[in-house]
Amino acid sequence: MMTDPIADMLTRVRNANSAYHDTVVIPYSKIKANIAEILQREGYIAGYRVDPVPGHATAKNLVITLKYGPNRERSISGVRRVSKPGLRVYAKAENLPRVLGGLGIAIISTSAGLLTDRQCAKRRIGGEVLAYVW
């Protein structure tokens, strides 16, 4: 049984990125698709799609296409899970984290859905800090 599917997703992306893989396959969930949407919008991944699992009626996989520079430079330098099942981390609108002085993003789960730290600051809402990406 997996206790932290978000950490599993981030680890798979980090490992595939370190090994210069073009794609990474992850079991699908709505929150993972939302995280992939944020990563695509912020320019960390090239794209993602949802594929059905062959032989299963309802199971789906999230296929993330990683992004590299012209000389195979990684677009993701690092990923860190912040709030874990054993230790939740929350931030108020006044105390939102800044990743690398604003060069990275913090993914935050709010009442308005998953947002980046900049979107939270603009809307003046806080929430659970899921991960840092830089």
From Swiss-Prot:
Keyword Coiled coil found: no
Coiled-coil ranges from the UniProt annotation: none
GO cellular component: ribonucleoprotein complex; ribosome
Biological process (GO), any one: translation
Gene Ontology MF: a single term: rRNA binding
UniProt keyword terms in alphabetical order: Ribonucleoprotein, Ribosomal protein, RNA-binding, rRNA-binding
Any matching Pfam family: Ribosomal_S8
Transmembrane regions: none
Gene3D superfamilies: 3.30.1370.30, 3.30.1490.10
UniProt family annotation: Belongs to the universal ribosomal protein uS8 family.
Function summary: One of the primary rRNA binding proteins, it binds directly to 16S rRNA central domain where it helps coordinate assembly of the platform of the 30S subunit.
Assembly, per entry: Part of the 30S ribosomal subunit. Contacts proteins S5 and S12.
PANTHER family: 40S RIBOSOMAL PROTEIN S15A
The protein, known as: Small ribosomal subunit protein uS8
Gene label: rpsH
